[in-house]
Design a protein with these regions (language model features):
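Long, contiguous binding/interaction regions
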Residues: 1-34, 39-121
Length: 121
């Protein structure tokens, strides 16, 4: 399943007691995403480089309706020229497939503006 296919899935609300994905389950999902890293098998992280502060805020504003529609909200760190996205399922303090779906959706939102002045790191 390519990243674009991951983005075609719907995020599923996590129920308490759902186990987080194991390292073995994470690896094939991560391989479908470009530039995302996993921290301690608990969080997905990616830094997006953009032209300036306005572009950073614009990118966050374009992520917002997607996150709202999916009911799955990334933590976003904004600074001049960069937006850093953190994804994990808070209820289980780990990763679920929905985190990977949302990562692919964020990549899809970023793609139309990617270019020489706006690039993911």
């Amino acid at each position: 399943m390519a990243a674009s296919n991951l983005a075609d899935n719907k995020c599923v609300p996590c129920r308490g007691g759902t186990p987080p994905l194991t390292h073995q389950q994470i690896e094939p999902l991560l391989a479908q995403l470009e530039g995302w890293q996993v921290e301690d098998d608990k969080k997905l992280i990616k830094s997006f480089k953009v032209k300036d502060w306005v572009a950073a805020v614009d990118f966050v504003n374009r992520i917002t309706p997607v996150a709202e529609a999916e009911g799955h909200h990334p933590d976003l760190y904004v600074r001049w020229g960069e937006v850093r996205a953190y994804l994990w399922t808070h209820k289980i303090d780990g990763l679920t497939e929905s985190d990977f779906y949302m990562a692919a959706m964020i990549d899809r939102v970023f793609a139309p503006t990617a270019g020489a002045s706006r690039q993911a790191k």
